[in-house]
């Protein structure tokens, strides 16, 4: 009897080991989804920040479920995205960020507008390219180049305009920030607090600056003697309160 139990236990262990081996040998995902989030009005990519508060790509695998759990991956700062570890399957794909949502619903949850894209990925090592045209809440454009002042602070000029005429996304501007960093990856999650100039607005105070040339100067005295990057971020009280951004610019210490 003991021998039989021994052989039975040994057999179960062998089966389990075999099953684990098969699972371990399952091929890793090797397909790529790449592309851009593009401003429908200008054709430029929509600037964002790196990390969880930036633009993200949303995938719904619809191959086996009508109500799948979303899978997200983050966009890069310049508005492009790339994920090289995607399984072969059928997906519904959209992007989420500081722009009019591609998928909109009414108060009952009924979809009223859907600009997401459906794709089918087959095989391995394939590349699927997707571009999404969106209407950013705000556009931020530099006016001229940053200027070094006599006291080694820097003054910049820029304009903020609306990126959409959608009546649901005309909220007041709540924040306008001049970010300073020693890398080009500056934003609300990566800046030097000694020199960054951050302004919060109440009511229509920030909104009244839309369309005007805005001037801001770094804080904290003389900048360090090194290459410095500047970037403007602004946001309205909508969506996930994410920032719209200018492109980063650098200036060499004189």
Indicate residue ranges for each PLM-predicted region.
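Short Pro-Gly-centered beta-turn/loop motif in secreted/extracellular proteins
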Residues: 82-99
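Bacterial Sec-dependent N-terminal signal peptides
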Residues: 1-44, 254
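Short, acidic Ser/Thr/Gly-rich low-complexity loop/linker segments typical of extracellular
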Residues: 62-80
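Structured interaction patches on ligand/partner-binding surfaces of diverse proteins
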Residues: 98-131
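Beta-strand-rich modules
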Residues: 217-241
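Short beta-strand elements
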Residues: 111-119, 240-254
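Short, ordered, surface-exposed loop/turn motifs in non-cytosolic proteins
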Residues: 42-66, 170-173
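Short amphipathic, basic-aromatic surface patches that mediate peripheral association
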Residues: 37-46, 159-168
């Amino acid at each position: 009897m003991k021998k039989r139990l021994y052989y039975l236990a040994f057999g179960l262990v062998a089966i389990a080991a075999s099953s684990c081996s098969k699972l371990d040998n399952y091929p890793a995902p090797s397909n790529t989804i790449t592309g851009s989030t593009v401003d429908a009005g200008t054709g430029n990519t929509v600037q964002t920040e790196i990390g969880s508060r930036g633009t993200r790509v949303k995938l719904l695998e619809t191959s086996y479920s009508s109500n799948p759990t979303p899978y997200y991956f983050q966009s890069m700062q310049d508005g492009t995205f790339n994920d090289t570890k995607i399984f072969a399957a059928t997906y519904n794909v959209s992007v989420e960020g500081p722009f009019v949502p591609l998928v909109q619903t009414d108060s009952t949850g009924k979809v009223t507008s859907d600009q997401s894209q459906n794709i089918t990925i087959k095989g391995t090592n394939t590349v699927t390219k997707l571009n999404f045209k969106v209407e950013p809440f705000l556009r931020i454009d530099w006016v001229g180049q940053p200027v070094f002042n006599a006291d080694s602070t820097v003054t910049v000029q820029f304009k903020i305009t609306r990126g959409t005429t959608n009546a649901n996304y005309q909220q007041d501007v709540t924040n306008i920030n001049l970010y300073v960093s020693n890398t080009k990856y500056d934003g609300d999650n990566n800046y030097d607090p000694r020199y960054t100039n951050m302004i919060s607005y109440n009511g229509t105070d920030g909104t009244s600056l839309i369309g005007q040339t805005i001037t801001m100067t770094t804080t904290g005295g003389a900048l360090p003697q090194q290459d410095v990057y500047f970037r403007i971020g602004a946001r309205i009280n909508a969506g996930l309160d994410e920032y719209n951004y200018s492109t980063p610019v650098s200036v060499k210490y004189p």
